[in-house]
Regions:
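Short catalytic-loop micro-motif centered on adjacent basic/acidic residues
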Residues: 544-547, 602
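Bacterial N-terminal signal peptides
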Residues: 14-24
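Sec/Tat signal peptide C-region and signal peptidase I cleavage site
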Residues: 25-29
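Lectin-like carbohydrate-binding module/patch detector with strong preference for beta-trefoil
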Residues: 30-178
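Beta-strand-rich binding-surface signature
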Residues: 80, 379, 542-544
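Small-residue packing motifs within transmembrane alpha-helices
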Residues: 8, 12-14
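Short, Lys/Arg-enriched N-terminal segments with co-localized hydrophobic residues
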Residues: 1-4
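N-terminal hydrophobic targeting/anchoring segments and the immediately downstream early-domain regions
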Residues: 166-524, 528-536, 553-555, 559-566, ...
Length: 717
């Protein structure tokens, strides 16, 4: 931007700073709000229109604390500031040595080595002489930035200043994760623009972007974003997992890693990685942005929690003397996660130059999704995957009014997809008997409901499960994969808990018929009368019903209702349906019935071979069912990153590669770490483009290109 006002002579000494104002060419912005938003990622110098002086950095009175003042009379000595949005309308100002213009008391400004609340400034614009000047108020003090000067005997203050944009090379770039892509458009997402119909691209039907709140917020480290940047979003995880990861109870229990180097940005010594995806985020927003450029059109983000596991976290925190988790109440957790997602949307908008300009867009209807996708952006649907979604476990009071109230609350939040049950039975219906953790889930079901799973022999077309039957001799070292890596305090707590659990379990069961429990067990609980009201309520609100994690009997009953009402809004988002057996071609097979209704199926992603193993056997039957009804056949992916599971392992891969949308991808760089799919696999969500390319190549070479085509039709279907 060119300066719109002539410099004036310095009339007095600068005593303090409190408001920033700048002038800009009016052609850059039509409104004052646009003028503010367009400051994102700019390099600027700040000049007083009254005196012509520039802000410089200098030593304070004692020569120790660095300060800023209008002390410069020429452009060459003026401090350069990089304007990094902290939120919509709020900015960090970082100088060339990565210090931040900050205020912790009225009329004082210092150079902070790292950002804090005093480094955040809310900027507003004022139209001046055909351009704009800007006023800045500190978020910490609530005071504006002023230049105080003397005019004769009169002390005056100036609170509107000119800003001159400088070449980006004159500023220190704010640290950030790289996309490492090349496109034909200045804005990479313009490459993804398409028509509102016949959308080409895929859906990830099962993600957990908000999982950092899981288990009270002390299980999964890292954040999708942070107001102060990537250094804070992906910092060392020892605050949650302890020194050497010794307090990472869930990771040590269900992961195959032992203690770990907790270092985050910029070195990322051990995480993110495919195995540490269990308890470390892979959803930093720039990684998700890179994934979008692979053809990811639609993303279902399931808020996720489990009150039993949160309670265990609470007990562990008490034993360790570490910070306690946030509220374990599911409604509270879902609200926090939904708030986080909308805050992320605003943050991405701020980075992109204003409201609605970011690639990440939360949608509530199919029409909204089509509009967002056509604009080259990622459509995001919010869902819930939790065991106590409606607070209707066997230990709680539950009735139709309670269900309706919760459903109304969730819908008003923006939630559009829900698992009616997850992991445990409820008064709504029965859960599928998950493997390989079915026995652990059985213990959780007892804690949550006061009883174990009821079982019955499975239908021949269903893959049954094996359940342990008492008495038990529980060994902590066998229950926890990395028991020996626990800290002494945590190991003692686990020993006490397991000993107590063993006494209870051996007193009250479970006891099963060996003929059923030895590999042919299905949950005997189906859809209850309360569940019928819930399903009809979801249909009335046009919400998506995710049938994964339901017992076979419950899923059949849900399909009966949907068929009777002609409702197509059913999904199986990651293949956890009917005991993971997708190979039945029977016309009454649940997934075939779901497909005939117009429902949608996504399969869990690992290697190409494992994906094919889930999809291929039933692919023809489901495709035929869709075609018979005139539906476009499409099978999405269900990555389930941060669903407490590992991600796709490394496989041979060649860089660079160019996808069908014309986007060229090189190895992804985050800080000092370069990620290579050949070495790292899908270490974080930003490596989804590599996974999809490996699918394309492998499926094409094996003669299964039709499956890849079905994947790329999945967003439309």
């Amino acid at each position: 931007w060119e300066l719109m006002m002539k410099n004036k002579m310095l009339l007095g000494r600068v005593c303090g700073l409190s408001v920033l104002v700048m002038t800009a060419n009016a052609s850059f912005a039509a409104t004052t709000q646009e003028a503010v938003d367009s400051l994102a990622q700019r390099c600027v110098v700040i000049q007083s229109p009254q005196s012509g002086a520039f802000i410089e950095r200098s030593k304070g009175l004692l020569g120790v604390v660095q300060r800023y003042g209008f002390d410069g009379n020429n452009l060459s000595s003026a401090e350069r500031f990089y304007l990094k949005p902290a939120a919509l309308g709020e900015f960090l100002l970082m100088d060339r040595v990565e210090s931040f213009l900050s205020s912790h008391a009225p009329s004082t400004t210092i150079a902070n080595n790292s950002p804090d609340k005093g480094s955040e400034w809310r900027i507003s614009a004022v139209a001046v002489n055909g351009g704009f000047q800007y006023r800045l108020v500190n978020s910490n003090t609530g005071k504006s930035l002023d230049r105080i000067y003397r005019n004769g005997l009169i002390i005056k203050s100036e609170s509107q200043f000119n800003l001159q944009q400088r070449p980006a090379s004159e500023c220190k770039a704010f640290p950030e994760v790289e996309l490492n892509v090349v496109t034909s458009s200045l804005n990479p997402h313009d490459t993804m623009r398409t028509s509102r119909s016949n959308i080409r691209g895929y859906v990830d039907g099962h993600t957990h972007m908000s999982a950092e709140e899981f288990g009270g917020g002390i299980t999964i480290s890292g954040h999708t974003f942070h107001r102060w940047g990537v250094k804070h979003a992906l910092k060392d995880c020892k605050d949650i997992h302890g020194e050497g990861g010794k307090h990472d109870l869930i990771g040590l229990a269900v992961g195959d890693y032992k203690s770990h180097n907790t270092t985050g940005w910029p070195s990322f010594s051990e995480w993110p990685s495919t195995k540490m995806a269990v308890t470390h985020t892979g959803y930093y927003y720039k990684w998700v942005e890179r994934a979008h450029l692979s053809g990811l059109r639609l993303m279902v983000v399931y808020t996720v929690d489990n009150e039993v596991m949160c309670t265990i976290n609470n007990a562990a925190a008490v034993a360790l003397g570490t910070p306690l988790p946030k509220s374990c109440d599911t409604l509270n957790s879902v609200q926090r996660q939904v708030n986080d997602l909308f805050a992320l949307q605003d943050y991405v908008d701020a980075q992109s130059g204003g409201l609605n300009k970011g690639f990440f867009r939360i949608v509530r209807t199919p029409a909204e999704a089509r509009t967002v996708i056509a604009d080259g952006k990622l459509a995001v649907v919010i869902g819930i995957e939790a065991s106590e979604t409606f607070n209707c476990s066997g230990r709680n009071f539950c009735d139709a009014n309670k269900l309706k109230s919760r459903l109304d609350t969730y819908h008003a939040m923006g939630v559009r997809s829900i698992f009616p049950v997850h992991k445990f039975d409820t008064q709504v219906g029965g859960a599928t008997l998950d493997t390989p953790s079915v026995d652990i889930m059985n213990m959780g079901n007892f804690i949550d409901n006061g009883q174990y799973f009821g079982v019955t022999a499975c239908d021949p077309s269903i893959q049954g499960n094996k359940l342990l039957s008492g008495p038990f001799d529980l060994d902590p070292a066998k229950l926890l994969k990395s028991y020996d890596e626990l800290s002494p305090v945590l190991k003692t707590a686990v020993n006490v808990a397991v000993t107590g659990a063993e006494a209870v379990i051996n007193t009250v069961g479970p006891r099963y018929d060996p003929a059923v429990a030895n590999g042919n067990a299905c949950n005997s609980k189906g859809l209850t009368s309360l569940g019928v009201q819930l399903i009809n309520g979801m249909i009335d609100r046009k919400m998506l019903i995710d049938v994964d994690h339901q017992s076979t009997l419950m899923t059949k009953a849900v399909l009966d209702i949907a068929e009777a009402r002609g409702y197509s809004g059913l999904v199986a988002s990651h293949g956890d349906t009917d005991g993971n057996k997708m190979d039945s071609t029977e016309p009454n097979f649940n997934l075939v019935r779901l497909t005939k209704l117009g429902g949608h199926i996504s399969a869990l992603t690992r290697t190409t071979e494992s994906f094919k193993g889930l999809v291929t056997p039933g692919y023809k039957a489901m495709t035929r069912a869709a075609n018979e009804k005139g539906y476009l056949a499409g099978i999405g992916i269900g990555s389930d990153y941060n669903g407490l599971i590992k991600m796709a392992s490394p496989r041979p891969f060649t860089y660079p590669f160019t996808n069908e949308f014309g986007v060229r991808f090189d190895k992804q760089v985050s800080g000092n770490r370069t990620f290579d799919f050949s070495v790292d696999g899908m270490a974080h969500y930003g490596l989804l483009p590599e996974l999809m390319e490996s699918y394309r190549v492998s499926l094409t070479n094996s003669g299964d290109a039709a499956i890849y085509e079905s994947m790329m039709n999945s967003a439309e279907s």
